[in-house]
From Swiss-Prot:
Active site: 2 (schiff-base intermediate with dna), 3 (proton donor), 58 (proton donor), 262 (proton donor)
Record HAMAP family: Fapy_DNA_glycosyl (MF_00103)
GO molecular function ontology, one term from the record: zinc ion binding
Annotated family: Belongs to the FPG family.
Keywords: DNA damage, DNA repair, DNA-binding, Glycosidase, Hydrolase, Lyase, Metal-binding, Multifunctional enzyme, Zinc, Zinc-finger
GO terms (BP aspect): base-excision repair
Catalysed reaction, written as an equation: Hydrolysis of DNA containing ring-opened 7-methylguanine residues, releasing 2,6-diamino-4-hydroxy-5-(N-methyl)formamidopyrimidine; 2'-deoxyribonucleotide-(2'-deoxyribose 5'-phosphate)-2'-deoxyribonucleotide-DNA = a 3'-end 2'-deoxyribonucleotide-(2,3-dehydro-2,3-deoxyribose 5'-phosphate)-DNA + a 5'-end 5'-phospho-2'-deoxyribonucleoside-DNA + H(+)
Name the UniProt record assigns to this protein: Formamidopyrimidine-DNA glycosylase
Gene label: mutM
A Pfam family annotated for this UniProt entry: H2TH
InterPro entries named in the record: DNA_glyclase/AP_lyase_DNA-bd, DNA_glyclase_Znf_dom_DNA_BS, Formamido-pyr_DNA_Glyclase, FPG_cat, MutM-like_N-ter, Ribosomal_uS13-like_H2TH, Znf_DNA_glyclase/AP_lyase, Znf_FPG/IleRS
Gene source species: Laribacter hongkongensis (strain HLHK9)
Quaternary organization: Monomer.
Gene3D superfamilies per UniProt: 1.10.8.50, MutM-like, N-terminal (3.20.190.10)
Length: 272
C-alpha cells in the first residue's frame, strides 16, 4: 500500500501539471471503487480550474476553489499518472481527467480498493478525514502530544504508532524503520514510552519520512510516481524485509514477528 512518502511524492509530481489547468472532461470506465464514483462527476468538474494539490495523511486533495475538492486514495495498488491525452487506456485504468493542455491524469487501480470522492466543504469535514491525528512532519506532532496520545495504551508500540488517531501516515514500512532509528523495541507497551524516548521517536519518524520522500518513496511491487518513476528508498532499509540479515548498527541478526497482523522487523540487541 502506498504510504505517506509515496503519496507525497505523487502530490509533488502532480502539482506542476495540474495547478492552473482546467478540467475539460472526465471519463469514468469503472465507477465501482471502494466507494462508488459520483455518477455526475464529469458534469461537476467540467470547466473547473485546479487551484491546489494537497495531501492529508494518505489522501490526495485536489482543490478547485469555493470548497470544492476531489479526495483521492490509492488503496493497495493504485496510481495516478500524467499522460498525453491520446494515450490508449490499459486494463484497470478506471478514470481519466482530461486537461486543457493536451494531457490527462489517469487513475489506475487493479484491486479497486482506492477511492475518488467529490466533496463540498473543508477537507477535514469529510468523515474519512475528520478524526485524523497530526501530520508527522508538522509542528503538531511533538513529544508532548505523542505521550498524551499513548497514555493508557497497552498495545504494542508499533501498533499504536500506525494508528492514524495518534499520527497519520506512518505505515508498516516506516514504522519499522523509525523504531529502529529510535532504538525502541516495537513489541513494548506503548504506555511505557518515556518523555525522552517520545522526543527521540518524533525525530526518528520525521527523519525517516523525510529521507523516504527525498528518495521518491519505496517501490516494492508496483508503486510509480506521477510520471511513472519508481521510488528508491527500499535500497536503504535498515530492518524492513531483512529477517536473518545483519543489523547495520550492531551486526546482530534482524528478527521478524507479527504485531497487529503485520510483519514487524527489528534488532533485539539494538532496540529496547
Amino acid at each position: 500500500m502506498p504510504e505517506l512518502p509515496e503519496v507525497e511524492t505523487v502530490r509533488a509530481g502532480l502539482t506542476p501539471h495540474l495547478t492552473g489547468r482546467q478540467i475539460k472532461a472526465v471519463t469514468v470506465r469503472e465507477p465501482r471503487l471502494r466507494w462508488p464514483v459520483d455518477p455526475d462527476l464529469s458534469a461537476k468538474l467540467a470547466g473547473l480550474e485546479v487551484r491546489t494539490v494537497e495531501r492529508r495523511a494518505k489522501y490526495l486533495l485536489i482543490g478547485f476553489g469555493h470548497e470544492q475538492w476531489l479526495i483521492v486514495h490509492l488503496g493497495m495498488s493504485g496510481s495516478v499518472r500524467v499522460l498525453p491525452d491520446d494515450t490508449p487506456p490499459q486494463k484497470h485504468d478506471h478514470l481519466d481527467f482530461i486537461l486543457d493542455d493536451g494531457h490527462l491524469v489517469r487513475y489506475h487501480d487493479p484491486r479497486r480498493f482506492g477511492a475518488v470522492l467529490w466533496h463540498l466543504g473543508p477537507p477535514d469535514s469529510h468523515p474519512l478525514l475528520s478524526r485524523l491525528g497530526p501530520e508527522p512532519l508538522s509542528d503538531g506532532f511533538d513529544a508532548t502530544g505523542l505521550l498524551h496520545a499513548l497514555a493508557g495504551r497497552r498495545q504494542a508500540l508499533k501498533v499504536a504508532l500506525m494508528d492514524n488517531a495518534v499520527v497519520v501516515g506512518v505505515g508498516n514500512i516506516y514504522a519499522n524503520e523509525s523504531l529502529f532509528e529510535a532504538g525502541l523495541d516495537p513489541r513494548r507497551p506503548a504506555l511505557s514510552l518515556t518523555a525522552d524516548e517520545a522526543g527521540q521517536l518524533v525525530q526518528s519518524v520525521r527523519h525517516t519520512l523525510a529521507r523516504a520522500i527525498a528518495a521518491g518513496g519505496s517501490t516494492l511491487r508496483d508503486f510509480r510516481d506521477a510520471i511513472g518513476k519508481p521510488g528508491y528508498f527500499q535500497q536503504d532499509y535498515a530492518v524492513y524485509g531483512r529477517q536473518g540479515q545483519s543489523c547495520p548498527r550492531c551486526g546482530g541478526l534482524v528478527e521478524r514477528c507479527r504485531l497487529g497482523q503485520r510483519s514487524t522487523f527489528f534488532c533485539p540487541a539494538c532496540q529496547r
